Amino acid sequence: MTNDNLCQIAMKFLHRNGFKVVFGARFQTVNTTGEQPDAIDFRHEASCLIEVKVSRSDFLADRHKRFRANPHLGMGDWRFYLSPMNIITVDDLPEGWGLLLVKGQRVCEMHGWPSNGVWSSEKPFIANKQAEWEHMYSALRRLERLGHLDAIHYGYPKKLKHA
């Protein structure tokens, strides 16, 4: 299983679980911390970051990143590692982190995934909103440069009426 495969699984998982603005690893930005999320999404009053790990050594190296050693610098009010089975255990997790385990092409086990009513009230982290803002701003700036930003001024398309 490759990093790209796992990133796609993470993005689909977020989308299926109520997060509708998913940014994946291919979306690279310049921000104050240098963090490049494998998958991050935003819903009303909460953000969720998924960090993909394909190997144990990759997971162990992650803790040395500046925004992991200093959690207040990182993105995500909720943070999860996603990996194939038998790479990361619940006992390995840093405080506040959850774990999503993949078998085949789907998340098969979840540790720390909250129920819908908890996303805004029991956040384990106070995300670096400046870094998140920079991430979203970069997306909007790219849309503007491509000439697509005007489309947001027109609202949702009206549903077609069938005769």
What is each model feature region?
Residues 22, 40, 100:
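Residues in well-ordered beta-strands of folded domains
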Residues 15-32:
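A short acidic/basic microdomain associated with nuclease active sites
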Residues 31-36, 56:
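A short, well-structured beta->alpha microelement
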Residues 47, 53-102:
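Catalytic cores of nucleic-acid endonucleases
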Residues 34-49:
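Active-site beta-strand-loop-beta-strand hairpin of nuclease catalytic cores
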Residues 1-16, 91-163:
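Non-catalytic C-terminal interaction segments of nucleic acid-processing enzymes
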Residues 3, 32, 60-62:
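A conditional alpha-helix N-cap/helix-loop micro-motif detector
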